[in-house]
Design a protein with these regions (language model features):
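N-terminal, polar/Ser/Thr-rich
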Residues: 7-34, 63, 499-500, 504
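Ligand-binding face of N-terminal immunoglobulin V-set domains in extracellular IgSF glycoproteins
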Residues: 32-60, 65, 80, 88-92, ...
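Extended, low-hydrophobicity, Ser/Thr/Pro/Gly-biased non-transmembrane segments
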Residues: 78, 82-117, 122-127, 149-251, ...
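Hydrophobic helix-coil surface modules that form long, contiguous segments used
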Residues: 180-188, 194-337, 366-369, 378, ...
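Beta-strand-rich binding/interaction modules
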Residues: 218-219, 512, 519-581, 593-603
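Zinc-dependent metallopeptidase catalytic helix centered on the HExxH motif
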Residues: 326-406, 469
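Amphipathic alpha-helical substructures
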Residues: 433, 439-528
Length: 622
């Protein structure tokens, strides 16, 4: 007996390592922070580093910053909504708010000194990037200790981070410390902050926070001192530790509630939210209840969650993922699932979001739809925390979605198809900061990125696609994968050549459009001609349904694949010779005559995102 075993070698690309030991004090009267960082930085590269860089994100929250000007410029572009309203192309949370901040509302981050071996280093500020000119270079394979003294003013909540948000949360503390810029095989990733994406160095965090003793604190990492002692100034001292992460977030508020539960061995889920009333209590209790229910499914589909805890925290301005935690404006489960899934596709895999936003947001959007559908279909109506009216709405939603194609992923496909027809589409490979419009960026990263996973299910088969996502996670967790890395795992999983698919889908805006071209009598069969109208070649499935109630699926693999997929469903699959990608038409023969045919349809599953389906189906009258 021969056993076929598919092995995935672990990649050996070098990456940097960092350990942070941060001690910071928050003055809740002045909204200021003073702190120190002790950093151990390991240069695992083959390069000698003569400079290093730090992110100073909060400096974006000042009038005429890059973020401010960029937002106001985007607001000059307008779109017409589905309701016919004129909509500005800026992020509605940012708009022109930064321009109108008062000095006491600014975000300010300042590094006073950085010393290495007792020697002060030269500091050059570039708004949200701090350049550090080293007195001695950091040699390959060496470790250096840096001591950083910093101070900051917490901005009023505008985007992601800040104080006193719309829901009344006192402090949502993300991007709050001088964070070292990632250096990788492409060099330093010194992207000025304009409210888009993040990328960080894998490391270990030991964070001590000091503040007013009336405040509750939670966030990334595991609390080391649950009793939180007082320091000499009467402030509570909180100490958190987290390992193999690339960011650290926390909240502080003096009117929060805290729920927690060990949902499986080695994993405790936490929920922190603003105290208000019994209705709010039920809504946040439902978050914990639902999270426990979907966790086994998430780990089955995406891989094991490796950290000892995860926290759902009310804060911020919508939903934003961080290491071992998320900030959420409210308890809506769609956002809850989305941000939690980011733990896999961003905080465990750690792709460069600026270059590959679709590998984060797109894969997460796909996962959100999958997990939400699973939850609503299997558990939602069992929740003790939602009303009977809400349960009826969920049942109606599940029934409505059952008639939408492609199944489960209808929203992503719809968003992508609207983008493809809008005239504003740019390639997914565009740097996240440099899309011409927010509309193009968001639909490329979220909708087109999510559609890509659905499309892979069409090309390689859904069982292979599901295996791909697990193989990708297990091969590349904690290793900063890029687009080529993902496609190589897809090729190894499927046995197909898929570089062509990546080039067309990621690096171009070419669209898929196929149509039924001609039908002719051919003795006891029919000759059906299919035409490729768009510039994007694909393998094609055509289902022929006969008047006797039988059906057959005619499958034409694309020559670029150098292979094909196995039969997926119950319909008999007839495999035809490969379709040469440059040929605009393809003709195949049915097994029954033309007068026996009831209908012919290209891709009835609608997993192939065809921009014009009006020519994909024909009903033949009696």
């Amino acid at each position: 007996m021969l056993l076929s075993v598919q092995l995935f070698a672990q990649p050996e690309r070098w990456q940097q390592q960092i350990n942070y030991k941060i001690d910071a004090s928050l003055d809740v009267q002045k909204n200021t922070i003073k702190g120190t960082e002790e950093i151990l930085y390991t240069n695992n590269s083959t390069d000698t580093l003569r400079k290093v860089y730090f992110h100073m994100y909060w400096n974006a929250f000042q009038p005429n910053s890059n973020m401010d000007v960029r937002s106001r410029e985007l607001g000059k572009t307008t779109f017409t909504s589905r309701r016919g309203d004129e909509v500005k192309d800026w992020d509605m949370r940012v708009r022109d708010r930064i321009q109108n901040l008062k000095p006491e509302e600014y975000g300010i981050q300042k590094v006073n000194t950085i010393t290495i071996n007792g020697k002060a280093q030269q500091l050059i500020e570039h708004e949200t990037i701090l350049e550090v000119v080293l007195t001695q270079p950091i040699l390959p394979k060496s470790v250096v200790k840096m001591n950083v003294q910093f101070e900051a003013q917490v901005p009023v909540q505008v985007r992601r981070s800040g104080r006193d948000n719309k829901e009344g949360v006192r402090y949502s503390m993300s991007q709050w410390y001088p964070k070292m810029v990632e250096y990788d095989y492409q060099g330093w990733n010194t992207n000025p902050y304009i409210a888009r994406e993040f990328y960080g160095v894998w490391g270990n965090y030991d964070v001590t926070l000091r503040m007013d003793k009336t405040y509750m604190v939670g966030g990334t990492g595991v609390l080391q001192n649950p009793t939180a002692p007082l320091d000499k100034d009467g402030n509570k001292v909180w100490n958190f530790k987290g390992n193999t992460i690339h960011d650290f977030v926390w909240f502080a508020d003096n009117n929060f509630k805290h729920l927690f539960k060990e949902v499986r061995k080695g994993l405790t889920l936490h929920v922190y939210y603003k105290a208000k009333d019994a209705k709010v209590d039920s809504a946040w209790a439902n978050v914990l209840w639902a999270a426990e229910k979907v966790l086994p499914y998430m780990e089955k589909k995406m891989g094991a969650y490796p950290y000892p805890q995860y926290s759902f925290i009310q804060g911020g301005d919508g939903g934003m993922e961080y290491a071992m935690a998320t900030l959420l404006a409210g308890p809506g489960l769609g956002t809850v699932f989305h941000e939690w899934i980011h733990s896999w596709y961003q905080h465990i895999l750690g792709s460069n979001e600026s270059l590959f936003a679709w590998m984060d947001e797109g894969f997460t959007s796909y996962g959100e739809d999958d997990v939400t559908h699973f939850y609503e279909k299997n558990f939602a109506t069992q929740s003790p925390y939602i009303s009977e009216v809400a349960k009826k709405q969920i049942v109606a939603n599940v029934e409505r979605q059952a008639n939408m194609l492609p199944a489960v992923q209808y929203g992503n496909y719809n968003g992508y198809l609207a983008l493809a027809k809008s005239g504003f589409e740019e390639p997914m490979s565009t740097h996240a900061d440099h899309f011409n419009t927010n509309y193009a960026y968001s639909n490329a990263a979220y909708s087109k990125g999510g559609t890509f996973i659905g499309l892979l299910g069409y090309v390689m088969g859904e069982a292979k696609r599901d295996q791909l996502m697990l193989n990708y996670y297990n091969t590349w967790k904690f290793k900063h994968p890029n687009a080529n890395d993902f496609i190589r795992v897809a090729e190894k999983t499927s046995g197909l050549q898929l570089q062509w698919l990546k080039e067309y889908w990621v690096n171009s805006t070419k669209t898929i459009d196929y149509g039924l071209n001609d039908i002719q009598v051919s003795g006891n069969a029919a000759l059906i001609s299919i035409q490729r109208i768009g510039k994007f070649p694909m393998p094609v499935e055509v289902v022929v349904t006969y008047k006797d109630g039988t059906s057959e699926l005619h499958y034409m693999p694309l020559d670029l694949m150098l292979g094909g997929k196995q039969q997926e469903g119950a319909i008999k699959q007839i495999n035809h010779p490969e379709w040469k990608w440059a040929q605009p038409t393809y003709t195949f023969e049915t097994t029954q005559p033309l007068n026996a045919i009831k209908s012919i349809e290209i891709d009835p599953s609608q997993r192939m995102p065809d921009i014009n389906r009006s020519n994909n189906k024909i009903e033949i009258p009696n």
